[in-house]
């Protein structure tokens, strides 16, 4: 969908502008065979891929570097339990259209479901005087929580028509940066116009703006990728794709969005991630090598599968 510049001030306030800039462009196609091979190695108990080289996972570091979504802020949660759309509107915005009047004979007027534009214009034409300037929500942790939950569900499906949701761009770029399996060739990138605003500069995902397309049959590729993952060695893994030391986060070939490093102090948090009804734990201590740190021993085994996945916020 073509981006409309009139949205910019409203998208920039909650910290979503870098991500919207990214996804409003043409993003690389999903390599379904690689995703399926990764799902086979996902463990919902640890929220990590169990590979021959050890555990690996998508962390808040990857969320910042690839999407630049804000991590710090209010959790993205709301009640999802209601008796209908009117009750949901009242819970979210404090009001809803009135019920249709009852006609003679006990029947209600037939009206379309949802709030009509005339009602929206009458009630929201002007910003309330007591409205907050901005509310920053933790969209980054919500995106990771939902991706974790989708991987949790997908790895336990037994039907052939099962799928997976969440931010597949985040998962794809994470995989391409770290693993040689199914990695496409990055040829170049389209021109990026940041309009002179550093916040509109690209994220790390821009490295994969234009990639080679997968032409082989999916089932054959899946078998090939499965074999390649079974033979992975630590030397083949790019443990720190974003660099290390003073060169960390330097793409060398283009200027990156400054927001990607703004919340680096939060990347090693062991905390619950919340996305509405999904609550998932962030466990970076299990993959310390991804942060350039020494992993002295395997973390203690804690099975969160049953207890954690009973938690719901709605």
Located regions from the model:
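Structural stabilizers in ordered domains
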Residues: 1-314
